[in-house]
């Protein structure tokens, strides 16, 4: 993780030099580092999981032991390797390596082989190692296992990829999927909480508790809680295989160490020696253990093993002591290897719990970023992989038992190889997880949710694409909560989470985005040398008494390990020394280490101590260390106790220790693209962050190589004349999202009310905001096969009049051909019968065939059976299409106004857009007014203005700066001009504000949403029109529409809409008994004609003269029949 220099290359301001760059069109030597950093958290976490983490996970999987024919069989995974994606040897191909573009084009999965070495033993005697294929696992694009790793842009283009391909996603069935980063509690840190619902866990339980999420090196996690009970004792609870267990704390402490009761008592009361209540509580906890007859560590282990072994699923030959040790290893403080370290940590948690219950310290806010970290994609991948490997071992026993029931099976190398091949593969579980985002797990992996873990990395535009890699979600469980506390923006989030980049709907505050400078720690570092370094700085080891009383010392925790105690007067010096080592890269201190010293305040505040963190998945960000003059990565917890200045004049000597790298470091990547965002109302910046991701832009450059279901393309994009410096930092001109437009703020017609806007028809005819939609369809003839047949190929039957001059000889349309409704789309032949089949184009929208790809099978031996046809649908802006500026000012195109009727300036210039001035007062988007002046001056002087937020202030006014530039060009200081009416030619009385604004065309188009129906398909049961645009269904008519018609008194129109045009039917009814079901058509005598002289009779009354016809909705007849099935009779009165 490189700290120095990454943000030093930030452009001082935007420029137009790229327009005259002589190397345009030539791929650069290296990829843009800023873009690659956006997905670094995803890629690096997967690299660790697939390489180092996999070996740690294999070591953490305990041997699977079971009895078979009076023998003890042991299976152990000793090694596992994931191979880069490739096709099997013997495949017909030029290169065995598989590349992502091939998987996208064939709707297949980008995956590699997982091979493991399985060691087996009988009765404890090793018998050998078998190399076994466990299945395919998905590979993250641009990771070290990907075949694109470290390739330069030129080679990436040769493999049909983007020159700036960032990776960070998986390809599942041809679709790019991203594992979401989720907010989880900070690992290996005791969090004091107050939860009233804990009182319902048992008699005497209180709302006080201390929780810790213990995480191992291979990311396996177990949540562990200490509960305070009313009688002063403590209960320890943990979860094993989704089941909650409770254990008195005294049993856990005595099981971990062979200390005497007095030693345990002395350790627990450290710092509280004078607290008689606490001393009595500790004595009571130890007395509970003695009352169960457990006086020694071995007796306690035997007792715990006897109680828990039924839930641990261990072999019968395991003694109780080993079962208890298995429990301690898998459920209690699992991040620690030493039982002594676990003992000291539980003692610290107990002291913190009593301090919370006695009101001596505050509770920690679990919704604060201080007590949180992120769940990285590699972490989920590794946890899921480890569990599935454990399940594979269990499946081998099941297969072995089934085989033994049918035949006499002996355990040898050959038989085990056959049985191993019958175990459950890991291929389908992984593809299901990434394809659906649903987690199928017996343990739950310690998550609060089992759905929504993955999302599609759709390339609607480049902003939306890259935001997938910077978003963090609070969790699906919190979306259903009625409370708003989890959604609040807390001050602790400053610099880590963007305050404006969050949706304005249901996910508001739950779906957040990291700031541009925020990073996620992805590396593990071994900290074996740090405890000795701390002791050298004055920290007293945990098993040694300090010089001062414990109440005058801080506990020192390093990644959840109780290292020792430090004098409270010496602690600031120790923290500063560690910080200096971190910044200067000395003493092997990692640069992402977090040094948080929580001081004693004499008041109930956060629990004091010196907490050191080097673990991954934490959020860190760079700031300038004023004392050392270098950049430093700081974490969320240590930022609470720092004085970080923003501007130079806020730095006070002896108080300010750090300074922000730049004022806009609190904004996300997308929010940094908003020009003059500091001049806008905050909600407008939120809206732009969302609308910027809905813009019809230029998401990629390899349209000809993509097979996405739908892609958008703006045909006439432009580089904005007014843009922040971050726009150039990320080279966003390669993926533009809008057009510079001449905008006049004038209420010129009646068609611009309620945010509607007028567009110059001449500009529209010249291609203003013209776009296209690319749609791809896969046709696989193998899906059309009948049972046992393989005889269909694409082609045209010679002389077929249906496809003359429409399809090529291969049965496919010509490239560039225009398709209309009913035109031949493609044709295929049955080689056995010679019969030809023609499929016709069924879409109502005309299109152009853009490209056709021919696909094969995995072995390269497939016939001409699978193709992908991509069509291009031109989309000119039409009335009703949505547009927006970069300041959250959205509106629809209401009218294309003829150029001869548009107002014009003295120079004859006509605006492209007429914007209603009533859109400014309530929205307060002053940034749009400034952009209009800046864009106008930029066009006049041939410049590109810097719109980075916070560069202007009250002393350095933006109005003064851009007004003077307009004045220098001969225009009005305030950006207004005299306009002339296009209708009368008369000069307008008011000065009109006119300038250049960058406008975006959004993807919400009338062509995708309009719906018209006269007659069409109906539902078979209710006889009502079907819903849905794709099936030409009826238009939805809801309660609000009904109420509107009732309010206007148009009841007959309501009758026509909801009855005549819906499911009107004529039914026979008995007037006497009021039944719709009793009238039945009588059966005629054999001599009668079947169609003549037949009449309805009431089966209840036995009469036919009481039968009449009524018009009722068909769904009512269905409803009456359903009620009759429940013995409920419906009687109608006829008036």
Curated annotation (Swiss-Prot):
Free-text comment on the cofactor? Two Mg(2+) ions are coordinated by both the catalytic residues and the nucleic acid substrate to enhance substrate recognition and catalytic efficiency.
State the Gene Ontology terms under molecular function: DNA binding; DNA-directed RNA polymerase activity; DNA/RNA hybrid binding; ribonucleoside binding; zinc ion binding
Name the reaction it catalyses: RNA(n) + a ribonucleoside 5'-triphosphate = RNA(n+1) + diphosphate
Q: Where is this region: Disordered?
A: 1-26
Q: Where Phosphoserine occurs along the chain?
A: 1051
Zn finger limits (C4-type): 1070-1101
Q: What is the name attached to this protein's record?
A: DNA-directed RNA polymerase I subunit RPA2
* Subunit text: Component of the RNA polymerase I (Pol I) complex consisting of 13 subunits: a ten-subunit catalytic core composed of POLR1A/RPA1, POLR1B/RPA2, POLR1C/RPAC1, POLR1D/RPAC2, POLR1H/RPA12, POLR2E/RPABC1, POLR2F/RPABC2, POLR2H/RPABC3, POLR2K/RPABC4 and POLR2L/RPABC5; a mobile stalk subunit POLR1F/RPA43 protruding from the core and additional subunits homologous to general transcription factors POLR1E/RPA49 and POLR1G/RPA34. Part of Pol I pre-initiation complex (PIC), in which Pol I core assembles with RRN3 and promoter-bound UTBF and SL1/TIF-IB complex.
Q: Which cellular component terms (GO) are annotated to the entry?
A: chromosome; cytosol; fibrillar center; mitochondrion; nucleolus; nucleoplasm; nucleus; RNA polymerase I complex
């Amino acid at each position: 993780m490189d700290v120095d220099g990454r943000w030093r290359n930030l452009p001082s301001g935007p420029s137009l030099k790229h327009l005259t760059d002589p190397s345009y069109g030539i791929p650069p030597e290296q990829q843009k580092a800023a873009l690659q950093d956006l997905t670094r958290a995803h890629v690096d976490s997967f690299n660790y999981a697939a390489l180092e983490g996999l070996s740690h996970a294999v070591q953490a999987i305990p041997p699977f032991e079971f009895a078979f024919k009076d023998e003890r069989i042991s299976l152990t995974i000793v090694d596992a390797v994931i191979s880069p994606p490739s096709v099997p040897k013997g495949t017909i191909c030029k290169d065995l390596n598989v590349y992502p573009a091939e998987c996208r084009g064939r709707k297949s999965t980008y995956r590699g082989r997982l091979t493991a070495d399985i060691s087996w033993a009988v009765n404890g005697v090793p018998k050998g190692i078998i190399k076994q294929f466990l299945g395919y696992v998905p590979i993250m694009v641009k990771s070290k296992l990907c075949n694109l790793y470290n390739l330069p842009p030129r080679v990436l283009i040769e493999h049909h990829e983007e020159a700036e391909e960032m990776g960070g996603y998986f390809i599942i069935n041809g679709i790019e999927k991203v594992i979401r980063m989720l907010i989880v509690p900070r690992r290996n840190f005791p969090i004091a909480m107050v939860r009233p619902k804990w009182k319902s866990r048992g008699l005497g339980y209180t709302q006080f508790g201390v929780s810790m999420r213990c995480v191992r090196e291979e990311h396996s996690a177990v949540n562990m809680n200490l509960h305070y009970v009313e009688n002063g004792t403590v209960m320890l609870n943990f979860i094993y295989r989704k089941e909650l267990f409770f254990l008195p704390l005294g049993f856990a402490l005595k099981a971990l160490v062979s200390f005497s009761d007095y030693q345990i008592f002395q350790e627990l009361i450290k710092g509280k020696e004078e607290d008689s209540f606490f001393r009595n509580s500790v004595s009571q906890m130890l007395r509970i253990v003695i009352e169960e007859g457990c006086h020694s560590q071995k007796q306690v282990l035997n007792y715990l093993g006897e109680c828990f072994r039924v839930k641990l699923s261990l072999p019968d030959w395991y003694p109780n002591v080993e079962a208890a040790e298995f429990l301690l290893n898998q459920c209690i403080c699992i991040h620690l290897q030493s039982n002594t370290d676990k003992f000291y940590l539980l003692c610290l948690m107990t002291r913190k719990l009593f301090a919370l219950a006695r009101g001596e310290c505050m509770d920690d806010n679990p919704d604060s970023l201080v007590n949180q970290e992120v769940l990285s994609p590699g972490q989920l991948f590794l946890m899921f992989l480890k569990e599935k490997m454990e399940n594979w071992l269990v499946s081998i026993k099941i297969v072995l038992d089934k085989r033994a029931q049918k035949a006499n099976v002996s355990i040898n190398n050959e038989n085990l190889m056959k049985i191993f091949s019958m175990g459950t593969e890991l291929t389908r579980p992984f593809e299901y997880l990434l394809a659906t985002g649903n987690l199928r797990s017996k343990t739950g992996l310690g998550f609060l949710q089992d759905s929504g873990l993955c999302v599609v990395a759709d390339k609607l535009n480049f902003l939306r694409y890259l935001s997938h890699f910077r978003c963090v979600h609070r969790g699906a469980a919190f979306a259903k909560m009625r409370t708003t506390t989890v959604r609040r923006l807390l001050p602790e989030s400053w610099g880590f989470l963007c305050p404006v980049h969050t949706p304005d709907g249901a996910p508001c505050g739950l779906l957040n985005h990291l700031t541009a400078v925020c990073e996620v720690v992805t590396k593990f570092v071994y900290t074996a040398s740090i405890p000795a370094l701390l002791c050298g700085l004055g920290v007293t080891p945990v098993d040694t008494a300090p010089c001062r009383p414990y109440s005058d010392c801080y506990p020192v925790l390093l990644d959840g390990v109780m290292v020792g105690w430090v004098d409270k007067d010496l602690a600031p010096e120790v923290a500063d020394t560690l910080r200096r080592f971190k910044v200067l890269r000395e003493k092997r201190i990692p640069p992402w280490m977090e040094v948080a010293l929580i001081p004693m305040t004499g008041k109930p505040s956060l629990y004091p101590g010196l907490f050191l963190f080097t673990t991954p998945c934490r959020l860190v960000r760079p700031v300038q260390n004023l004392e050392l003059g270098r950049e430093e990565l700081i974490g969320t917890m240590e930022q609470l106790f720092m004085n970080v200045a923003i501007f130079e004049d806020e730095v006070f000597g002896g108080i300010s220790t750090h300074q922000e790298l730049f004022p806009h470091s609190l904004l996300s990547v997308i929010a940094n693209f908003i020009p003059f965002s500091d001049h806008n109302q905050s909600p407008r910046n939120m809206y732009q962050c969302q609308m910027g991701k809905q813009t019809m832009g230029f998401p990629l450059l390899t349209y000809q190589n993509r097979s996405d279901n739908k892609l958008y393309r703006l045909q006439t994009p432009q580089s904005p004349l007014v843009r922040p410096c971050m726009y150039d930092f990320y080279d966003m001109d390669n993926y533009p999202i809008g057009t510079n437009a001449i905008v006049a703020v004038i209420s010129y017609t009646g068609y611009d009310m309620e945010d509607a806007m007028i567009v110059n028809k001449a500009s529209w005819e010249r291609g203003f905001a013209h776009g296209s939609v690319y749609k791809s369809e896969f046709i696989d003839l193998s899906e059309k096969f009948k049972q046992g047949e393989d005889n269909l190929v694409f082609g045209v039957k010679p002389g077929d009049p249906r496809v003359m001059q429409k399809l090529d000889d291969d049965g496919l349309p010509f490239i560039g051909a225009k398709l209309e409704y009913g035109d031949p789309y493609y044709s295929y032949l049955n080689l056995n019968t010679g019969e030809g089949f023609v499929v016709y184009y069924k879409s109502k929208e005309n299109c152009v065939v853009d490209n056709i790809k021919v696909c094969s099978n995995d072995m390269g031996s497939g016939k001409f059976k699978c193709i992908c046809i991509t069509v291009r649908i031109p989309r000119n802006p039409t009335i009703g299409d949505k547009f927006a500026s970069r300041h959250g000012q959205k509106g629809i195109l209401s009218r294309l106004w003829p150029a001869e009727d548009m107002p014009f300036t003295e120079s004859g210039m006509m605006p492209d857009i007429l914007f209603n001035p009533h859109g400014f007062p309530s929205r307060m988007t002053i940034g749009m007014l400034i952009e209009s002046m800046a864009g106008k001056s930029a066009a006049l002087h041939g410049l590109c203005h810097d719109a980075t937020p916070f560069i202007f202030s009250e002393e350095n006014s933006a109005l003064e700066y851009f007004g003077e530039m307009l004045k220098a060009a001969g225009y009005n200081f305030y950006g207004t001009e005299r306009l002339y009416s296009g209708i009368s030619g008369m000069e307008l009385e008011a000065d009109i504000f006119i300038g250049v604004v960058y406008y975006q065309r959004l993807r919400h188009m009338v062509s995708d949403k309009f719906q018209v129906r006269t007659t069409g398909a109906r539902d078979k049961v209710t006889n009502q029109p079907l819903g849905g645009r794709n099936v030409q269904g009826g238009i939805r008519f809801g309660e609000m529409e009904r109420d509107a018609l009732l309010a206007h008194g148009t009841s007959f129109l309501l009758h026509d809409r909801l009855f005549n045009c819906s499911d009107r039917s004529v039914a026979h009814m008995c007037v006497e008994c009021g039944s719709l079901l009793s009238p039945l058509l009588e059966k005629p005598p054999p001599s009668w004609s079947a169609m003549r002289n037949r009449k309805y009779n009431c089966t209840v009354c036995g009469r036919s003269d009481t039968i009449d016809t009524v018009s009722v909705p068909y769904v009512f007849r269905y409803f009456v029949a359903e009620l009759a099935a429940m013995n409920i009779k419906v009687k109608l009165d006829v008036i």
